[in-house]
Amino acid sequence: MQMVINEMKQKAIYPGTFDPVTNGHIDIITRASTIFPELIVAVASNKNKRPYLSWESRISLLEESVGHLTGVRVVGFDNLLIDFVLEQNAGIILRGLRAVSDFEYEFQLAGMNRKLSKKVETLFLTPAEHLMYISSTLVREIAALNGDISQFVPPNVVRELKKRQNERSL
């Protein structure tokens, strides 16, 4: 039994909507890839929200952004996170914390996931200091007003958001 638990702890899931993926997300994924032999970046379909980018687009942009990292896989999911984690035989949920304001929600989420399965732990990483203020919401707002988002997101995301802005202005 102990060996199975240890194997599960070798695989982490980093879930999110990634709408769009930011340099803060990439920082956490890059650093986590050096900690865990296997990291699954799990892109939530999140039917309750109206995403700016399609699920397929978000998955594709992430694959392009982290494809060079060893042991990292990008997967979409549309079920309960804890069920997805167990289906993947993972033992760690990795979450990013930007500010104290994120902590309360993340703390509640971690507690709920712990109630749903004692086999899974939640770990938190903070992005690099210069990336802590970046959020997908702020990036979308800046992009919508034709602002320069190149310092906040990977180049492929800049291109995709510009393309979307051009399509909307037609």
Curated annotation (Swiss-Prot):
Q: Has the keyword Nucleotidyltransferase been applied to this entry?
A: yes
Q: Spell out the Gene3D superfamilies in the cross-references.
A: HUPs
Matches recorded under SUPFAM superfamilies: Nucleotidylyl transferase (SSF52374)
- GO process annotations (BP): coenzyme A biosynthetic process
The catalysed reaction is: (R)-4'-phosphopantetheine + ATP + H(+) = 3'-dephospho-CoA + diphosphate
Q: Name one GO cellular component term.
A: cytoplasm
Pathway assignment:
Cofactor biosynthesis; coenzyme A biosynthesis; CoA from (R)-pantothenate: step 4/5
Gene Ontology molecular function terms on file: ATP binding; pantetheine-phosphate adenylyltransferase activity
Q: List, separated by semicolons, the cofactors it needs.
A: Mg(2+)
What is the stated purpose of this protein? Reversibly transfers an adenylyl group from ATP to 4'-phosphopantetheine, yielding dephospho-CoA (dPCoA) and pyrophosphate.
Q: Which UniProt keywords apply?
A: ATP-binding, Coenzyme A biosynthesis, Cytoplasm, Magnesium, Nucleotide-binding, Nucleotidyltransferase, Transferase
Keyword field contains Transferase: yes
Question: What organism is the protein native to?
Answer: Legionella pneumophila subsp. pneumophila (strain Philadelphia 1 / ATCC 33152 / DSM 7513)
- Give the protein name, as stated in the record: Phosphopantetheine adenylyltransferase
Q: Which InterPro entries match?
A: Cyt_trans-like (IPR004821), PPAT (IPR001980), Rossmann-like_a/b/a_fold (IPR014729)
Family to which this protein belongs? Belongs to the bacterial CoaD family.
Question: Which enzyme class?
Answer: transferase
Subunit text: Homohexamer.
Pfam families per UniProt = CTP_transf_like
Site keyed Transition state stabilizer: positions: H25
Q: Which domain of life is it from?
A: Bacteria
Tell me which residues bind ATP: T17, F18, H25, G96, L97, R98, E106, L131, M132, Y133, I134, S135, S136, T137
> Where do the annotations place substrate binding?
T17, K49, L81, R95
Instruction: Report the EC number(s), separated by commas if there are several.
Output: 2.7.7.3
Where does the protein end up? Cytoplasm
Q: Which gene encodes it?
A: coaD
